[in-house]
């Protein structure tokens, strides 16, 4: 669904339906899903102070009549929120909150009062209903610009909202920060404080409960337990009803939530989005979620709500405490006070005991709901860089040569480096704060990665050629002094990085049922080093990007995978994690995140401020999720149609936040002897190459040349504009990184480098994937650039392949290699010429095609990738139980 700005609310009064009060019922259970009889429940209205009570029967069941509205006169059947975006060009949304299931009809009416489209004619579901209009009429024809009415009718009640359709309406972004539809819902419905109590259990208090029109609500009570989870030989374990501990293999997922148009500090998700995402995670078969930092209170409220409703199989939380990267000094000791303060803040928030004032870039609010019982452990910190460790160790040893041990209240360490001592102190502070303030302890770790592992890697070049095996942090020496949840090692370990995972001869001897697997060798060796200490993969996974930033011995590369391959490889990885007796792993990640950057695409990428406004399908780091974000179908009417008038009939063009599109209509089927050439001039008609690869003279000098055929479609770039080797600094002198005037100079297939000077690897992205509809053995993939279907060809080219630095800003690469800066230029639009290998066709667009810039993310839909369904269908068949 789309992110919605809830600008206003219309209250609809039903004349015939009494929904002022509803029956609320459910069960009160403990964490082992056992019923709790004779538990008392109290619902106190936050506005009137009126209290409603109930008690559970022998089966833990309760029931009571609870008003949904404060006053009997306020009987309502549904609530209508405003239309968004408005004005719109592609899609707009009508949002209805139904207090009960009632039949409704949603219509689009033009300015003449004619109904041009019935969008919806069915019962509304209880809760939120999202109804989208794509600007088309009942027959699928595009409606002209102008004012329209979106109208909902249910029984005798009708509500209408005006909406303006413009062909080039300004892009509408997403709502950020702490605005949530439930904030508006609270203004019109009753809100309660809920207290649930039973002898022998902790009192449960929910300070702000909204029934939401649902009739069933379950509650979970926990025993007073100082050690609900602990580490037990290789695994984290949960206390059972008989006070023994049962090991858990963690099959978790990392909860990144940076939707298009947002950055991590926004934490912009609404309650409704959290509910949907947790449901997807749960239905896929995951048992835990990991957060890196503190979220807004609404996330923890939804987590508690979700786990109460799924008490037989809850989603356990692995909560993080972030260590700032923007530190004043690389000396870790100078960040101690700030980091300890962050630890205390997170612990207080998890126990419902902190109010944080408004601040920029971080979550804030009133944390008054105790969710600590849903937390199985904490991972604090981040991937610390080798230079930070080297700097800290050298400086602190110089100041204090005896800084090699620490004897704390809960942890101690000997024969340690100052950095290891620093981590031991932070872990000890964490455990002491939690134990002294809240009389509780759960397993604890700090984030690490292979770059700092305690192993020696003979294949890795020494510093300064490489810093990947330069230093280490070894907390296997950490000892438990006083009873607590224990320590477990946590690594972000992927199958393609660093190089030693692929190159060490020992690791390369390993294989699994899929084939050679040096990653399995690395995990086996690392786990053997830690012995019985639990080793958890805090991150693992492969992305479904078009570009491949790093090759892997196992074939599980840093990108270059289809969504299907992504799913298969992620199943392979969790199998590897399980068979090496690791404690489990957290798949990275829930969703694609457009804000992310990486070295592979950085030299021709947009600035941080604008990166989240468009989708770079080439970048591996943007495409790790199993949720993708798609805008509506490209509009091929925004630019004039090009009549080629030969066996190639017509050409149309379009764009979206990810691709530039070319649609060709043919008068006959393309055959194996045909080649269609498309010359693309991306900026400045006076720059570029004048001659195509086949010797054909171009109408307009161009930077790119696309060869469409049914055996090997290729995308070429002029030698001058070629960026091959740009990141590593070993491009040829003839590569200017800008378009120049050339006549008969070479055309190169678009390629990227994903290795170092000494280890050059080539990613030939210009060799385009294609789908041939007439081939019964062919199936479309998420990486296909060319689609052949009957007498139609659709081409989609990622912006990055065309050296478009930032499509949202109309910005293309136009560099001066003589400066340190990377120069760009605002394009004057694309000009395209189409011709064939028979030289029977040749036609160019008359005008340059320039798309409007946008400053906010386009409205989008969430789409589950093919990889999600592979995971969901595979997990039940995997025996992911602790050994």
PLM segments and residue spans:
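Surface-exposed, glycine/proline- and aromatic-rich loop segments on solvent-exposed faces
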Residues: 644-753, 813-839
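Acidic/polar low-complexity flexible segments
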Residues: 681-703, 790, 803-883
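Aromatic-rich peripheral "rim/lid" segments of glycoside hydrolase catalytic domains that contact
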Residues: 552-555, 576-652, 864, 868-874
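N-terminal carbohydrate-binding accessory modules
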Residues: 222-280
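Short, acidic Ser/Thr/Gly-rich low-complexity loop/linker segments typical of extracellular
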Residues: 47-67, 172-179
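Glycoside hydrolase catalytic-domain groove-lining segments
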Residues: 466-553
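Short, surface-exposed loop/turn motifs with a glycine/proline- and acidic-biased composition
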Residues: 121-156, 170-173
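Glycine-centered coil/turn sites that cap beta-strands in beta-rich domains
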Residues: 68-84, 88-110, 130
């Amino acid at each position: 669904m789309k992110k919605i700005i809830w600008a206003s609310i219309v209250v609809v009064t039903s004349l015939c339906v009494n929904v002022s009060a509803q029956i609320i019922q459910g069960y009160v259970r403990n964490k082992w899903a056992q019923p709790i009889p004779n538990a008392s429940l109290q619902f106190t209205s936050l506005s009137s102070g009126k209290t409603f009570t109930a008690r559970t029967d022998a089966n833990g069941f309760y029931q009571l009549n609870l008003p949904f509205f404060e006053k009997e006169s306020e009987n309502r059947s549904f609530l209508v929120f405003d239309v968004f975006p408005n004005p719109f060009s592609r899609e707009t949304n009508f949002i209805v909150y139904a207090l009960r299931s009632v039949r409704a009809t949603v219509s689009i009416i033009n300015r003449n009062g004619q109904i041009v489209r019935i969008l919806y004619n069915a019962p509304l579901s209880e809760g939120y209903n999202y109804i989208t209009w794509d600007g088309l009429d009942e027959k699928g024809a595009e409606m002209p610009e102008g004012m329209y009415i979106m109208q909902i009718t249910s029984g005798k009640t009708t509500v209408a909202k005006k909406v303006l359709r413009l062909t080039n309406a300004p892009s509408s972004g997403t709502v950020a920060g702490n605005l949530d539809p439930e904030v508006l819902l609270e203004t019109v419905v009753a809100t309660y404080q809920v207290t649930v109590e039973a002898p022998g259990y902790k009192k449960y208090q929910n300070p702000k409960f909204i029934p939401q029109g649902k009739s069933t609500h379950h509650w979970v009570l926990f025993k007073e337990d100082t050690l609900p989870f602990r580490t037990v030989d290789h695994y984290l374990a949960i206390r059972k009803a008989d006070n023994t501990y049962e090991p858990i293999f963690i099959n978790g997922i990392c909860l990144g939530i940076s939707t298009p148009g947002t950055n991590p500090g926004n934490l912009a998700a609404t309650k409704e989005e959290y509910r949907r995402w947790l449901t997807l995670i749960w239905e896929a078969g995951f048992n835990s979620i990991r957060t890196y930092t503190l979220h807004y209170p609404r996330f923890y409220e939804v987590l508690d709500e979700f786990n109460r409703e799924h008490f037989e199989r809850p989603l356990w939380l692995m909560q993080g405490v972030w260590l700032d990267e923007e530190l004043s000094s690389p000396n870790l000791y100078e960040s101690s006070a700030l980091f300890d303060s962050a630890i205390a803040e997170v612990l207080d928030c998890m126990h419902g005991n902190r109010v944080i004032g408004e601040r920029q870039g971080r979550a804030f609010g009133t944390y008054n709901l105790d969710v600590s019982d849903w937390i199985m452990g904490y991972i604090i910190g981040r991937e610390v860089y080798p230079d930070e460790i080297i700097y800290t160790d050298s400086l602190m040893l110089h100041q204090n040569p005896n800084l090699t041990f620490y004897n704390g209240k809960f942890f101690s360490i000997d024969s340690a480096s100052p950095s290891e001592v620093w981590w031991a102190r932070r872990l000890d502070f964490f455990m002491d704060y939690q134990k002294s303030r809240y009389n509780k302890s759960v397993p604890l770790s700090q984030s690490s990665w292979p770059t700092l592992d305690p192993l020696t890697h003979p294949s890795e070049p020494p510093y300064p050629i490489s810093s990947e095996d330069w230093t280490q942090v070894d907390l296997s020496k950490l000892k438990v002094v006083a009873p607590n949840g224990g320590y477990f090692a946590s690594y972000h370990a992927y199958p393609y990085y660093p190089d030693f995972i692929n190159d060490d001869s020992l690791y390369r001897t390993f294989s699994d049922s899929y084939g050679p697997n040096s990653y399995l060798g690395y995990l086996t060796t690392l786990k053997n080093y830690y012995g019985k200490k639990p080793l958890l993969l805090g991150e693992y996974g492969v992305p479904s990007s078009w570009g491949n930033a790093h090759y892997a011995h196992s074939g599980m590369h840093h990108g270059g995978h289809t969504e299907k391959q992504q799913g298969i490889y992620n199943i392979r990885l969790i199998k590897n994690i399980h068979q090496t007796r690791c404690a489990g792993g957290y798949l990275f990640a829930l969703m694609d995140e457009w804000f992310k950057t990486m070295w592979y695409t950085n030299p021709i990428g947009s600035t941080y401020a604008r990166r989240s406004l468009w989708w770079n399908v080439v970048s591996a780091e943007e495409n790790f999720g199993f949720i993708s974000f798609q805008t509506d179908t490209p509009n091929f009417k925004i630019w004039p149609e090009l009549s080629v008038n030969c066996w190639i009939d017509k050409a149309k063009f379009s764009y979206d936040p990810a691709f530039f599109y070319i649609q060709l209509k043919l008068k006959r089927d393309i055959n194996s002897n045909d080649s269609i050439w498309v010359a693309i001039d991306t900026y400045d008609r006076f720059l570029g190459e004048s001659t195509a690869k086949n010797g054909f003279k171009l109408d307009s000098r161009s930077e790119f040349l696309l060869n469409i055929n049914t055996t090997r479609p290729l995308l070429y770039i002029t030698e001058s504009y070629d960026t091959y080797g740009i990141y590593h600094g070993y491009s040829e002198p003839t590569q200017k990184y800008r378009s120049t005037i050339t006549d008969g100079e070479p055309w190169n297939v678009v390629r990227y480098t994903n290795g170092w000077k000494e280890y050059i690897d080539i990613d030939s992205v210009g060799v385009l994937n294609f789908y041939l509809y007439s081939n019964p053995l062919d199936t479309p993939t998420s990486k296909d650039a060319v689609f052949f279907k009957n007498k139609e060809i659709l081409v989609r080219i990622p912006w990055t392949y065309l050296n478009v630095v930032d499509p949202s800003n109309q910005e293309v690469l136009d560099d001066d290699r003589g400066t340190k800066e990377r120069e760009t230029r605002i394009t004057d639009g694309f000009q395209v010429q189409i011709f064939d290998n028979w030289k029977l066709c040749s036609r160019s667009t008359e005008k340059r095609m320039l798309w409007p810039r946008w400053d906010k993310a386009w409205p989008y839909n969430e789409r589950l990738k093919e990889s999600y369904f592979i995971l969901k269908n595979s997990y039940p068949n995997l025996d992911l139980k602790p050994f």
